[in-house]
Amino acid sequence: MSQTNTTDVTAYMQNVGKEARAASRALAAANTGDKNAALMAIHDVLKNAKQDILAANTVDMDNGQKNDLDAALLDRLELNDARFDGMLQGLKDVAALPDPIGEVTDMTYRPSGIHLGKMRVPLGVVGMIYESRPNVTLEAASLALKSGNAIILRGGSEAFESNQAIAKCILEGLKNVGMSEYSVQVLETTDRAAVGELITMTEYVDVIVPRGGKGLIERISRDARVPVIKHLDGNCHTFIDSDADPEIAINVSVNAKTHRYGTCNTMETLLVDEAIADELLPKIAEAIVEADNAMQLRLDDKAQAILNDNTILKGHLSAATAEDWDTEYLAPILAIKILSGIDEAIEHINTHGSHHTDVIITDNYTKSQRFIREVDSASVMINASSRFADGFEYGLGAEIGISTDKIHARGPVGLEGLTSQKWIVYGHGETRA
């Protein structure tokens, strides 16, 4: 399918929204078996279309390289055998998850005689705007279907062919089980005006989930009239406390930084307690550079004093600037700062971090508990890599995004994050006095 520009974007989007709203009402009433059948039907169609999808992705990758797409976006754009298999497994995982819809909690009797509680229900229609990552098309669709929501997906132009190939499979799977084809709509236009329409269609769309660069998220947050679930960036920290286990400190730091660069849960700043910096920082820095010889370390004055004469690190070191403490690199670059202790670490993270994911490496229980209480982030970890901040790793099956907001959903947003609760009341003819 080739890229198309809709001449009347407003009319096109109004129709998309209207169909999504109608589909959402049917989905809200669908039972768990029907939703799981749809997911597995999509799985089977997708599995048989592997070569077509990978071929479409090759077209996108070739275009991305010709258009000088940066390395982080190319990494997110690529679909290989392992990522394709992960997409298939993700569908199975979501199908296996408990269905939150219809769950009733907090039932209680009131003195008036009424019996009341809360029932979990879908949000309705989800609008998603994202860059690269064609696997997100499938993950978002599967979570929306399982949680009883219709979804409108607007991927980036760089992933157009991949997204349309996946959309074709989703549509066929839905048709195979008799579910509305408008339950999942992948926009067939690259016109940016479609985004402006989507984020202002309050009569049809209940929530917007943007995933992409900081500029995209800022624009959506500024212009949207529909509520937004978002995070701006992932400036994640690892703090090596004076009571850290050296082996854990080294292994976690290497994994958090070098496992993948193009992800929002990758460590961007390493903080080290000055009490152990002389002994431990060189070992950590050497291990990180050994893991990736392209690594560049940007150091504060104290870190420079410790590392500048290290021959192994020659060519990998430079002085940090004030901007480095606020930067999500998405690249083999790591900022390193030496601190006086946990007080300064917490202050630095809460000042410069993005409230995404932050880690402390320590064997001191008291300090670990203080860190998780006082660091203001969606995920706070003790002795584990920030790379675990992920819906799949958290047992959510998949995630539609990660939220650093504090209202409605925070952290990886899975099925429950795509629902709300309504009050239900049972009575026997009670009237209010």
From Swiss-Prot:
Query: Which reaction is recorded as catalysed by this protein?
Result: L-glutamate 5-semialdehyde + phosphate + NADP(+) = L-glutamyl 5-phosphate + NADPH + H(+)
Could you state a single Gene Ontology molecular function term? glutamate-5-semialdehyde dehydrogenase activity
> What is this enzyme's EC?
1.2.1.41
- Pathway, according to UniProt? Amino-acid biosynthesis; L-proline biosynthesis; L-glutamate 5-semialdehyde from L-glutamate: step 2/2
Matches recorded under NCBIfam families = PRK00197.1, proA
Functional note: Catalyzes the NADPH-dependent reduction of L-glutamate 5-phosphate into L-glutamate 5-semialdehyde and phosphate. The product spontaneously undergoes cyclization to form 1-pyrroline-5-carboxylate.
- Protein known as: Gamma-glutamyl phosphate reductase
What's the source species for this entry? Answer: Psychrobacter cryohalolentis (strain ATCC BAA-1226 / DSM 17306 / VKM B-2378 / K5)
Q: What is the lineage of its organism?
A: Bacteria, Pseudomonadati, Pseudomonadota, Gammaproteobacteria, Moraxellales
Q: Which gene encodes it?
A: proA
